[in-house]
Amino acid sequence: MARVTVEDAVKQVGNRFDLVLVAARRARQIAVQGKDPLVDEENDKPTVIALREIELGLVNNQVMDTQDRYEQQEQEAAELAAVAAIAEGRG
């Protein structure tokens, strides 16, 4: 298991407080939402995986915001298509 130093991850994010927010958000994506890790899992917990991704510069707040917006647009498009299909069935 590779050690993650907070100092290296802080350099990527800017400060410790933002690091906590970004790491928690990414760890939730991996653990709860089933997102695929961008690094090898190596039997690490989601929080360690998130910190390793941040340390390598693979994940930051902007990347996650962009991904969330894209997924939101996909979800809205799917919902509109479902509503249109239901409306066609009634018409």
From Swiss-Prot:
Keywords: DNA-directed RNA polymerase, Nucleotidyltransferase, Transcription, Transferase. It comes from the Bacteria. SMART domains: RNA_pol_Rpb6. It catalyses: RNA(n) + a ribonucleoside 5'-triphosphate = RNA(n+1) + diphosphate. Gene3D superfamilies: 3.90.940.10. GO terms for molecular function: DNA binding; DNA-directed RNA polymerase activity. One of its GO terms (cellular component) is DNA-directed RNA polymerase complex. Its EC number is 2.7.7.6. The RNAP catalytic core consists of 2 alpha, 1 beta, 1 beta' and 1 omega subunit. When a sigma factor is associated with the core the holoenzyme is formed, which can initiate transcription. HAMAP family: RNApol_bact_RpoZ. Promotes RNA polymerase assembly. Latches the N- and C-terminal regions of the beta' subunit thereby facilitating its interaction with the beta and alpha subunits. NCBIfam families: rpoZ. Belongs to the RNA polymerase subunit omega family. This is DNA-directed RNA polymerase subunit omega.
